Amino acid sequence: MKIGIVTGIPGVGKTTVLSKVKEILEEKKINNKIVNYGDYMLMTAMKLGYVNNRDEMRKLPVEKQKQLQIEAARGIANEAKEGGDGLLFIDTHAVIRTPSGYLPGLPKYVIEEINPRVIFLLEADPKVILDRQKRDTSRSRSDYSDERIISETINFARYAAMASAVLVGATVKIVINVEGDPAVAANEIINSML
């Protein structure tokens, strides 16, 4: 399967846009799979007793986060190999804001394993992201609850995505998630992969 990595900071709407990507691809009868990098990491972290929920993973020591990243990359790469023709999209982050600084979400040992065709940066205005976070009470995102931090994280994500892309010859594409119409971003992502 061709792999596209869809990144974006918490609250930008990655999961919503990727749900729309799946819906559109199903309508077009294109084989597809959407995987969440964090789900792979979370399953391993919970098995090892490191965390009780997804949001605790950002606060783990960096060495433990790296271990979880490697396991997730291997699992996803295997899924893509076994998936045949079609498109596989990974829902993840280009950077993770941790207490000790920004952790690359797609470091060399991850990006080379996955070898994507495109790294997408799903973005929105920081004010819009903050509003979305406030509406989503199911998640704990206090470490991203300031416009300045959101802007800083978006910039670091751009730098990190380009650095990762250089290692595997992938392209990097910024896609704006328009408020109220995830189909716009979804179609832009799909068209970049076909």
Swiss-Prot record:
Signal peptide (UniProt feature, chain positions): none
One protein family per Pfam: AAA_17
Annotated family: Belongs to the archaeal adenylate kinase family.
Catalysed reaction, written as an equation: AMP + ATP = 2 ADP
Primary localisation category: cytoplasm
Binding locations of ATP: 8-16
Gene3D superfamilies on file: P-loop containing nucleotide triphosphate hydrolases (3.40.50.300)
Protein name: Adenylate kinase
Species this protein is from: Sulfurisphaera tokodaii (strain DSM 16993 / JCM 10545 / NBRC 100140 / 7)
Superkingdom to which the source organism belongs: Archaea
InterPro entries: Adenylate_kinase_AdkA (IPR023477), P-loop_NTPase (IPR027417)
Presence of the UniProt keyword Chaperone in the record: no
Gene field: adkA
